[in-house]
A protein has these predicted regions:
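Glycine-rich, proline-tolerant flexible connector loops at the mouths of alpha/beta enzymes
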Residues: 80-97
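Active-site acidic/histidine proton-transfer and metal-coordination neighborhood
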Residues: 10-11, 16-21, 44, 65-66, ...
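Catalytic-core regions built around general acid/base machinery
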Residues: 94-104, 149-156, 246-250
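Histidine-acidic metal/acid-base catalytic patches
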Residues: 2-51, 60-77, 131, 176, ...
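Non-membrane alpha-helical structural segments and their capping/turn regions in soluble enzymes
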Residues: 92, 96, 120, 124, ...
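Active-site beta-loop-alpha junctions enriched in small/polar residues
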Residues: 55-59, 82-86, 114-117, 143, ...
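Pocket-edge positions in alpha/beta enzyme catalytic cores
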Residues: 59, 87-90, 171, 236-239
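Solvent-exposed, acidic/flexible segments
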Residues: 60-64, 91, 120
């Protein structure tokens, strides 16, 4: 299954997470029923091309056991692995035990990151880690001056890089257009992790940017926000300003 077939949720707290999961499930419902006094007619199941998962960073203050119990309670089965749950220097035995623990909860680790890379040594470490973990997607934040070296690593390891954007909070990769301008002429395995909330807080139209750059969108972080400015706050899906019903339609249209 292609790594781009997963959507990551990047929510701040448990209440927001629960609301977001419920709202998105409603938006992507696969079965509808029409009832009468004598019969129930079910429409054919529509299989989605994408799945809802969890950004490991959402559980930065929680251990792996708590994280997995929460995912099970939310009926979520995909996790982007963060290094505070599986350290960058983990050996094969530790990685195997980690994957088994995820499997015990019905969870699959589909990517690693975000991993920040400020030197060539950190680029090497990040890609070697992704290979040992056994994933084909690395969510990363390499310094601009390292992109030539990162491109070599992408080719060497045959691992996709999804550069994570930061919105107005950091000067490094503030929005989708900035990432696009830095990867458009590079190896096609170099793309972005589109954080639709951060992107909008920078003043960029996240839905329009998805349409423009969808061929290089390998992962997404989902959050609603209250305003298209730095002052915008995270909000439960449906309580902010992002048009999620239209967003889901776009994911289907462009076969995310």
């Amino acid at each position: 299954m292609k790594r781009r077939n997963f959507i990551m949720s990047s929510m701040a707290g448990m209440a927001t997470l629960a609301m977001s999961s419920t709202s998105l499930e409603a938006l992507t419902s696969k079965t509808s029923e029409k009832s009468s006094a004598n019969s129930t007619i079910k429409k054919p199941v529509q299989e989605e091309e994408f799945h809802l998962g969890m950004a490991g960073y959402s559980f930065v203050h929680f251990d792996l056991e708590t994280t997995l119990k929460t995912l099970k309670a939310l009926d979520m089965h995909y996790l982007c692995i963060k290094d505070f749950h599986l350290p960058l220097d983990s050996n094969e035995e530790q990685i195997a035990a980690f994957h088994q623990k995820l499997a015990d909860y019905g969870v699959k680790g589909y990517a690693v990151g975000p991993i920040y890379m400020k030197s060539k040594a950190e680029v090497d470490r990040a890609f070697a880690y992704a290979r040992r973990v056994g994933v084909n997607l690395l969510v990363g934040v390499p310094n601009y001056e390292l992109l030539d070296y990162v491109e070599e690593a992408v080719k060497q390891y045959d691992i996709k890089l999804a550069i994570h954007l930061h919105g107005p909070d950091m000067p490094l990769y503030p929005d989708a257009t900035d990432i696009w301008n830095h990867v458009k002429d590079r190896d096609e395995r170099m793309g972005m992790c589109l954080d639709i909330g951060h992107n909008l807080r920078y003043g960029s139209d996240s839905l329009a940017d998805y349409i423009r750059y969808h061929k290089r969108v390998f992962d997404m972080h989902l959050k609603d926000v209250t305003a298209p400015t730095k002052a915008g706050q995270r909000a439960e899906v449906g309580r902010g300003i992002i048009d999620f019903p239209r967003f889901i339609k776009l994911l289907r249209k462009y076969h995310y």
